Each structure stands twice: as C-alpha cells, then as structure tokens.
C-alpha cells in the first residue's frame, strides 16, 4: 500500500465546522495572504528550524553553553515533531478535505490530513523557542499557535481535529525533548568534537 493512499475520512460535523470557519474568516481582508504566509513559514518546520539555528549560532558566539542547549532543543523539537506527525499520518491515512463546498487556498505536499504537521511542529517550536528566548512560559505559544491552527482551516487543508491533535502531539514532543538536558549537551559536545576533528584534518594554506 502506498504511503499516500487514504483510508479514513472525516465526519460530517467536521466538514460543517470547517465550512463555518471559512464562511466567517476566509473573505476578510488580508486573512488569506496571512494564512498562506504562515503556511510557507511552517512548511516542513523550516521557519522554526531556521529560527533555532540563528539562536544557536548567537549562543555559540557568546559562549553561552546553557543557551546552546535550549536553542538546540528547539531545533530538535521542531524536526522531531514534524517527523512524528508524518509517522502518524502514514498510519491513519485520513484524506484531506475534499468536499466541494470547501475552498482550498494553498497547495500541499501530501494528500494526508491527520494530524496537521504545521500544528505539530509549530506548537513544539513555539514552546521550545519561547523557553530558549527566556520568555514567560506559554507566551510564545499563545502568539503563534492559534493563528497557525486557524490558518490551516481557513486554507481548507485540515479539519479541526487535525489541528487540535497536532497541537497536542507537538506539546508532547516538546516535553520529551526537554526531559533531560544532558542528552542534548552530549550531542552538542559530540558535534563540537567532530567539528574540531574535521578542522584538524584540513590542511592549512601553507601546507597545500
């Protein structure tokens, strides 16, 4: 069976809820462009990985070991959450919204719907990026997560249960990543050692 085959479908109440959201929000000025912008930012968690990378580099330049761990966890969490959502999608194989009354406002890389990878990675990243930035707990998720979840409905590419489950899965992934800072510290130490070893093997300009 292909990983893109679809077996599950959403019920009528989910379809009605999605149509209701689009009826209220989709035609408001600026909503669709903003939703598409969020879609591109969260695609494959690339925007969140980039943000974590910038923070990690800045912490490295400052020599702040604790901050490096936090920013590394943000990147790891975003990647891990995205991967977890893909794994669940391939088990559930729910088809994306396809009712003719639903307006689809953006292309998607997959026909699979449950859970929303955007919701999963954004929730994990928001929790972990907020922690790395030193913001109050819940502050960044409160700003980032609701708009991302709503945007997936406005664009007609997910059902309400897709985004709700994705957010829950993302929170679980964030908690798993931060359970033991020592694992991340060891990974960073290994990466640093590997980098030094590689640099040590590269001949200097005078040796070439």
Where are the regions a protein language model picked out?
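Short helix-capping/hinge motifs at transmembrane helix termini and TM-loop junctions
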Residues: 43, 59-62, 92-93, 134, ...
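Residue-level signal for the membrane-embedded core of alpha-helical transmembrane segments
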Residues: 45-49, 75, 79, 120
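Membrane-helix interface segments
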Residues: 28-31, 65-70, 98-99, 133-139
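Alpha-helical transmembrane segments in multi-pass membrane proteins
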Residues: 73-77, 81, 85, 89, ...
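Membrane-embedded catalytic cores of phosphoryl/pyrophosphoryl-handling enzymes
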Residues: 55, 99-208
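Interfacial segments of alpha-helical transmembrane regions
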Residues: 55-83
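Basic/polar, acidic-poor N-terminal "presequence/leader" segments
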Residues: 44-58
């Amino acid at each position: 069976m292909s990983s893109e085959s679809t077996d599950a479908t959403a019920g009528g109440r989910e379809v009605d809820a999605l149509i209701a959201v689009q009826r209220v929000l989709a035609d408001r000025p600026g909503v669709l462009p903003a939703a598409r912008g969020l879609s591109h930012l969260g695609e494959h968690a690339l925007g969140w990985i980039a943000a974590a990378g910038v923070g990690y580099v800045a912490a490295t330049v400052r020599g702040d070991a604790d901050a490096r761990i936090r920013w590394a966890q943000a990147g790891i969490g975003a990647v891990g959450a995205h991967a977890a959502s893909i794994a669940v999608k391939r088990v559930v194989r729910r088809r994306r919204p396809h009712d003719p009354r639903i307006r689809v406002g953006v292309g998607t890389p997959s026909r699979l719907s449950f859970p929303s990878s955007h919701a999963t990675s954004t929730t994990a990243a928001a929790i972990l990026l907020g922690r790395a930035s030193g913001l109050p707990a819940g502050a960044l998720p409160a700003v980032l997560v609701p708009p991302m979840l709503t945007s997936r409905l406005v664009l007609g590419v997910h059902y309400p249960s897709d985004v709700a489950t994705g957010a829950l899965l993302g929170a679980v992934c964030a908690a798993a990543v931060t359970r033991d800072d020592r694992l991340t510290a060891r990974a960073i130490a290994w990466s640093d050692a590997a980098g030094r070893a590689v640099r040590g093997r590269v001949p200097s300009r005078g040796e070439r």
